Design a protein with these regions (language model features):
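N-terminal Rossmann-like FAD-binding beta1-loop-alpha1 element of flavoenzymes
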Residues: 23-51
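Extreme N-terminal leader/targeting segments of oxidoreductases
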Residues: 1-25, 43-47
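Helix-loop-beta segment of a Rossmann-like dinucleotide-binding subdomain
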Residues: 20, 121-134, 171-213
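Central beta-strand plus flanking loop segment that forms part of the substrate or channel wall
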Residues: 75-77, 274-302
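Glycine-rich FAD pyrophosphate-binding loop
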Residues: 43-66
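Dinucleotide-binding Rossmann-like beta1-alpha1 core, especially the glycine-rich loop
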Residues: 71-171
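Helical element adjacent to the flavin cofactor pocket in flavoenzyme catalytic cores
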Residues: 188-254
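Flavin (primarily FAD) binding-site architecture
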Residues: 257-272
Length: 321
């Protein structure tokens, strides 16, 4: 009698292939990272088989959710951490140029998908909104002026405006100036070609497109509990359904861990050398939401301030539309 196929995972031998799925690629997490990569892969290699595995009931429910990030189309228009002040007093814009080009590449991808019909309504996830930088105090004003001079000379940032006039800033972003001392030293830059991006909406759009393609599948409320390398070089993911406790396995040639905070433990379980030297730590902050249309209607911009010396970039105060 012929033996049934078997799979051995760390001492566990399975003789039933019914709960084993073999694919080319496994995407862990159903956020903007996994959906974008999935689209890339299917556009380049349409014949690839891809399975997406998500722990939560739906896509984009954590970091990609529109209320869990600033929704800024990061093009270095207003993010001051991309333009550090050097020891010689000059502003280094090399990182800003790199980030600007990267966002332009994202827009090119979205434009391509729109022309193809994969994205039906671009305004469902991306819309124009001015990007502003706002600073206080003589030293920061001096820095912002140098930054504007350096950036506005480059075609990527053509049209960027600069002012130290509170009245002008009040026209751009009245809530930022309201209640301030008129004699306070402030400055702002503005570029009207900035973008607001709903990464949550974009994730859903991309996932719906992927679902329409042959060879793609997605499962939800499925948690990856183990990542093991097999003798043939493929990866075996152990997956447990959070509702039924049903266990199954996915074998893939390529695995992408796009699971946000859950990616690090899975990376460590893989045992690859690159998993060494990483750690996760909690970052707290205050994210305030205003549902009053009377107040929200007075603000139409993404205004980024300057982080304190020694503080991480995510500590930058900003007021977003």
């Amino acid at each position: 009698m012929a033996k049934s196929p078997s799979l051995k995972i760390k001492g566990l031998k399975l003789n039933n292939q019914a709960n084993i799925t073999e694919v080319d690629c496994a995407l862990v997490g159903a956020g903007i990272m996994s959906t974008t990569l999935g689209v890339f892969l299917k556009e380049i290699h349409p014949d690839l088989s891809i399975q997406m595995i998500e722990t939560l009931p739906g896509e984009a429910q954590e970091s990609s959710n529109s209320w869990n990030n600033a929704g800024t189309g990061h093009a270095a228009n207003c993010e001051l951490n991309y333009t550090p002040l050097e020891a010689d007093g000059t502003v280094n814009i090399s990182k800003a140029l790199e980030v600007n080009v990267e966002f332009d590449l994202s827009r090119q991808l979205w434009s391509y998908l729109t022309k193809k019909g994969a994205i039906k309504t671009p305004s469902a996830f991306i819309n124009p909104v001015p990007h502003m930088s706002f600073v206080e105090g003589d030293a920061h004003v001096s820095f912002l002026k140098k930054r504007h001079t350096a950036l506005s000379a480059h075609h990527c940032f053509r049209g960027m405006e600069y002012t130290e006039d509170q009245a002008q800033i009040a026209q751009w972003a009245p809530l930022v100036i309201k209640g301030r001392n008129p004699s306070e030293k402030v400055a702002a830059t503005r570029i009207i070609t900035g973008a607001d991006v709903s990464y949550g909406s974009l994730t859903s759009i991309l996932l719906n497109y992927l679902k329409s393609l042959p060879g793609f599948s997605a499962s939800f409320q499925d948690e990856v509990t183990a990542v093991d390398r097999e003798a043939d070089g493929r990866w075996c993911l152990t997956i447990k359904n959070r509702q039924t406790d049903h266990k199954r396995f996915v074998k893939a040639k390529f695995v992408f861990l796009g699971a946000g905070g859950g990616a690090l433990p899975l990376l460590q379980k893989s045992g690859i050398p690159e998993s060494e030297g990483y750690a996760g730590f909690p970052v707290s902050g205050i994210w305030l939401r205003c549902d009053s249309q009377e107040i929200a209607s007075q603000h139409e911009a993404k205004v980024y301030g300057m982080a304190s010396v020694g503080s991480p970039p995510m500590s930058v105060p900003h007021l977003d539309t």
